[in-house]
């Protein structure tokens, strides 16, 4: 498997920064979390309806589909600078860390020094090639999120879906996610208007 490094080591800088993350009201946290890619604690989502897993790309709004393709084009080119340009062309720079980092390329190179940061592009491709979900419909936080694991309880995954998960994470990663109660590896969120809101890992 390409992603042999344990999950904790791969996202350690991001997880460390969570200690400093400010806490506002529940409503503010919910809205901000949806836009930033934060994973809600398992207890907060108990009883919530599980969104439909979508694989048909034709169901994406045109602007969402175009943004996804621009991201994939940059990632497949193996060019971090090209991906940065896509981020900068966005309405707002997508959330790429829950910490205070200002330079995504510097962060990715620090997390994946062996590949000089390029491993993040492979992860991004894998994430955007999985099924996705359409969440927070009809609200300002409406979003298309990849991979669907971010909004589907791990205990409900079929064997086939677990194999798909293992393309992104190791068995050890999966065990840690089960202990936490949710998928906490990289995910992408793009709004119906094509705005790319986040590409983050962590909870």
Q: Where do the model's predicted regions map?
A:
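C-terminal-biased regions
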Residues: 31-69, 81-203
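Bacterial N-terminal signal peptides that target proteins for export
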Residues: 1-12
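Short basic-aromatic helix/loop recognition motifs at nucleic-acid
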Residues: 72
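Bacterial N-terminal signal peptides
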Residues: 10-20
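Boundary at the C-terminal end of the N-terminal hydrophobic targeting segment
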Residues: 25-29
